C-alpha cells in the first residue's frame, strides 16, 4: 500500500509550524492548510515573532536545565531557536476528537453485561444496568475481528455506528504486534517472529534478528486490512485509534527481559508501530491516533520517561498522532493534578489532595503518582524532546475508580476490590491536556487466567502475576479466572460493587462549547442514561471561535526570502547565521498599494493565496 510521505519538507520548505497556545480549540470548519495574515500594522508581525521566539527560548532553556542532555543544550543557539521542527499536523490532530460527539456503545458488550445482570441483585445489579449504556473501546486483538457484518467486528461496528441519526464516535484498540506482550504471558498474540511447533511464539529465537516474516504477516494480514476498512468509512464518522498497548513502554523499561530486549522483538515493535501509525493515518486522515504510553507507575520516573521520549522520537510518527493513551487496561488512580512537576517529592505538601499516593510512588521519587500528574509530565517531556510536538492525552478510567486496593502497584492482573471509574467524558480536570476519560479496557474482560481455568484445564498462557496476592482467584473460595479477554462474571460484579462513575459531573461535550450536555454517558442512540431528552451531537463551531493562529502552519513569502538573500550575500558571522535563520520565519504581507491585490506572483495578495493553497 502507498503511504503518504513525511510532512517535513525535504528542502527545508517555506513553511514553519510554530505552536501558539490557545484557550479554545481552533474551528473545525477551517481547513488545515497554510494560513496567511495580511498585516495592516507592523506591530502585528512584531508581536507574533516576539511571542514565538520568547516561547521557544523559554522552553528550550527549561529543557536544557531539566534534562541536561547535550542534544537539548545544542538547541540553545539563536539559529536553532528560529528553526523549529516543521510540523504539518493532519486534521485529526487539530482539535479534541471527542468534543461534541455521541459515543458508540457496543451491543455485544451489552449482551455480556446482561448475562451478569441476570444473576446479580441490589446495588450491584443497578450499577451493571447503568453500565450497559456507557461507551467503551473495542479491541482488535486478532485478525478475525477486522471484517464482518456483526458488532463483533470492526467493519460491523462502523456500519452500526454510521447508521445512527448522528454518526457516533468509535474507539478501537489496535493490538496484534508480532511477539505481543513480551514481558508477560497472559496476552501473548497470534503473530510471531518465530513460531514454536504448537503455534505459540518462541520469544528467544531471534531468527534473522529483524522479525521479517512476522512483520510481513502483521502488515499485510492485519494493519493493511484495518486500513482497507478505514478507507471505506473515512470521513463518514469519527474514529479514534489507540495503538499497541504495552509495546513501546516495554522497550523503554524491560530490555533486560530477553523476551523484550532481543533484536527480533525490538524490530517488530518499533517497525510495526511506525508502520501501523503511518498506514492508518494515510488510510483515514480524519481518524485520531493515540500511542500507548503505559501509566505513571511505569514510565513516571524521569529516566523511564526520558527513554520513552527517545523511543517515540526515533519512530518519527509525531506528525501523525494526536497524542497518547495512558493507563490502558490499568488500575492507576486518576487523582488530582499538581501545579508544578516536583510538587510532592521530598515529603513536600503531603496534605495536598494532588499528592495523595495510594501506591507509595512518591517515596520512590516518582512524581507521576496519579494519572493526571503523569499526563502533565509526559506532555512536558514530549514537548521538550520533540520540538514543535504538543501531545494530548486520553486516560483509561475503566477500572481505576478505587485507590489503594493493591498491596503493590506493580500488580496488574484482575485486581481484587477494583471499581469502574469515570464514565466517558471530555469534562476532564485538565482539558487543555487531557482530551477525554474513556473506558479503553472493557470492564468485565479478564486480564489473564489463573493456573487452572474455570473448566479445570491448565491455562497455556498462565502468568505468575495473575497469582499475586491482589489477583482474583488467588484466595481460597474465589472463582478461577478465564483467559485474557474472556468474560469474568465475578470480576465485573466487583467492579460494579465498588464503582465510582461520576455520573453527576459527566458531559460528553467539550465544557467550553455552548451545546447541550448530558448528566451521563451517551448511549448508542445518543441518549443520556438519566435524561432521555438530552443528547450530545456533533456541532459546527462558528468561524469566529478560538485563536485563529492556534495549530496553523504559517506562510513564508518567497519574495521576503529573496530580499533577505541580498543581505545574506554581504553578511558574516553571527549576523549571517541569524539572517539565514530568518529565511524560514513567517511575516505579514502589506497591502499598501492597489496593485498588490491581484496577480500571479508572490508580490500580490492573489498570488500569495494561490501559493499557500
Regions found by a protein language model. Give the residues of each.
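Intrinsically disordered cytoplasmic terminal tails of membrane proteins
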Residues: 1-32, 75-76
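N-terminal signal-anchor transmembrane helix specifying type II single-pass membrane topology
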Residues: 30-62
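N-terminal, immediately post-signal peptide pro-regions of secreted/luminal proteins
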Residues: 60-91
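N-terminal carbohydrate-binding/catalytic regions of secreted carbohydrate-active enzymes
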Residues: 93-229, 441-471, 475-483, 495-502, ...
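Structural recognition of the beta-strand scaffold that forms the well-ordered cores
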Residues: 102-105, 137-141, 169-174, 238-244, ...
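Surface-exposed substrate-engagement region within the catalytic domains
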Residues: 118-126, 299-471, 569-577
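Mobile, glycine-rich extracellular loop/lid and propeptide segments
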Residues: 168-283, 288-300, 613
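Extracellular mucin-like PTS domains
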Residues: 507-508, 513-540
Amino acid at each position: 500500500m502507498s503511504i503518504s510521505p513525511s510532512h517535513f519538507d525535504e528542502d527545508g520548505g517555506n513553511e514553519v509550524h510554530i505552536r501558539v497556545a490557545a484557550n479554545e480549540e481552533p474551528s473545525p470548519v477551517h481547513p488545515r492548510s497554510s494560513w496567511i495574515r495580511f498585516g495592516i500594522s507592523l506591530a502585528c508581525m512584531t508581536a507574533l515573532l516576539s511571542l514565538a521566539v520568547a516561547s521557544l527560548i523559554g522552553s528550550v532553556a527549561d529543557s536544557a536545565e531539566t534534562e541536561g542532555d547535550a542534544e537539548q543544550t545544542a538547541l540553545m543557539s539563536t539559529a536553532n531557536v528560529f528553526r523549529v521542527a516543521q510540523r504539518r499536523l493532519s486534521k485529526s490532530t487539530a482539535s479534541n476528537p471527542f468534543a461534541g460527539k455521541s459515543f458508540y456503545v457496543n451491543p455485544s458488550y451489552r449482551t455480556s453485561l446482561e448475562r451478569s445482570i441476570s444473576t446479580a441483585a441490589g446495588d450491584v445489579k443497578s450499577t451493571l444496568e447503568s453500565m450497559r449504556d456507557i461507551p467503551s473501546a473495542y479491541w482488535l486483538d486478532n485478525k478475525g475481528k477486522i471484517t464482518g457484518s456483526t458488532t463483533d467486528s470492526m467493519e460491523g461496528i462502523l456500519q452500526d455506528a454510521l447508521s445512527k441519526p448522528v454518526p457516533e464516535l468509535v474507539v478501537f484498540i489496535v493490538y496484534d504486534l508480532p511477539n505481543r506482550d513480551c514481558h508477560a504471558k497472559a496476552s501473548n498474540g497470534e503473530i510471531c517472529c518465530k513460531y514454536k511447533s504448537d503455534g505459540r511464539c518462541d520469544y528467544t529465537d531471534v531468527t534473522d534478528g529483524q522479525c521479517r516474516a512476522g512483520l510481513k504477516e502483521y502488515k499485510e494480514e492485519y494493519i493493511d486490512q484495518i486500513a482497507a476498512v478505514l478507507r471505506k468509512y473515512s470521513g463518514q464518522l469519527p474514529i479514534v485509534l489507540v495503538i499497541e498497548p504495552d509495546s513501546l513502554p516495554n522497550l523503554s523499561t524491560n530490555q533486560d527481559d530477553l523476551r523484550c530486549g532481543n533484536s527480533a522483538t525490538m524490530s517488530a515493535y518499533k517497525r510495526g508501530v511506525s508502520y501501523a501509525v503511518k498506514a492508518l493515518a494515510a488510510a483515514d486522515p480524519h481518524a485520531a491516533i493515540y500511542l500507548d504510553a503505559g501509566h505513571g507507575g511505569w514510565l513516571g520516573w524521569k529516566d523511564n520517561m526520558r527513554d520513552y521520549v527517545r523511543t517515540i522520537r526515533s519512530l518519527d510518527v509525531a506528525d501523525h498522532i494526536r497524542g497518547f493513551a495512558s493507563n490502558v487496561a490499568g488500575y492507576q488512580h486518576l487523582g488530582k493534578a499538581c501545579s508544578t512537576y516536583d510538587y510532592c517529592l521530598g515529603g513536600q505538601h503531603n496534605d495536598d489532595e494532588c499528592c495523595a499516593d495510594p501506591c507509595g510512588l512518591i517515596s520512590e521519587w516518582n512524581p507521576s503518582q496519579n494519572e493526571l500528574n503523569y499526563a502533565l509530565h509526559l506532555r512536558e517531556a514530549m514537548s521538550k524532546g520533540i520540538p514543535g510536538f504538543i501531545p494530548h492525552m486520553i486516560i483509561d478510567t475503566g477500572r481505576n475508580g478505587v485507590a489503594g486496593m493493591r498491596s503493590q502497584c506493580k500488580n496488574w492482573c484482575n485486581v481484587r476490590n477494583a471499581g469502574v471509574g469515570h464514565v466517558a467524558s471530555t469534562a476532564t480536570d485538565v482539558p487543555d491536556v487531557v482530551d477525554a476519560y474513556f473506558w479503553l479496557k472493557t470492564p468485565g474482560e479478564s486480564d489473564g487466567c489463573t493456573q487452572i481455568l474455570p473448566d479445570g484445564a491448565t491455562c497455556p498462557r498462565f502468568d505468575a502475576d495473575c497469582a499475586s496476592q491482589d489477583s482474583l482467584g488467588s484466595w481460597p473460595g474465589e472463582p478461577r479466572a478465564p483467559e485474557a479477554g474472556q468474560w469474568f462474571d465475578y470480576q465485573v460484579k466487583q467492579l460494579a460493587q465498588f464503582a465510582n462513575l461520576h455520573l453527576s459531573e459527566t458531559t460528553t461535550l467539550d465544557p467550553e462549547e455552548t451545546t447541550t450536555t448530558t448528566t451521563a454517558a451517551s448511549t448508542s442512540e445518543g441518549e443520556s442514561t438519566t435524561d432521555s431528552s438530552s443528547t450530545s451531537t456533533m456541532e459546527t463551531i462558528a468561524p469566529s471561535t478560538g485563536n485563529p493562529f492556534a495549530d496553523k502552519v504559517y506562510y513564508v513569502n518567497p519574495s521576503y526570502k529573496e530580499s533577505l538573500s541580498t543581505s545574506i550575500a554581504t553578511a558574516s558571522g553571527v549576523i549571517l547565521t541569524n539572517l539565514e535563520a530568518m529565511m524560514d520565519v513567517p511575516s505579514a504581507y502589506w497591502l499598501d498599494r492597489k496593485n498588490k491585490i491581484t496577480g500571479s506572483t508572490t508580490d500580490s495578495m492573489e498570488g500569495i493565496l494561490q501559493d499557500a493553497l
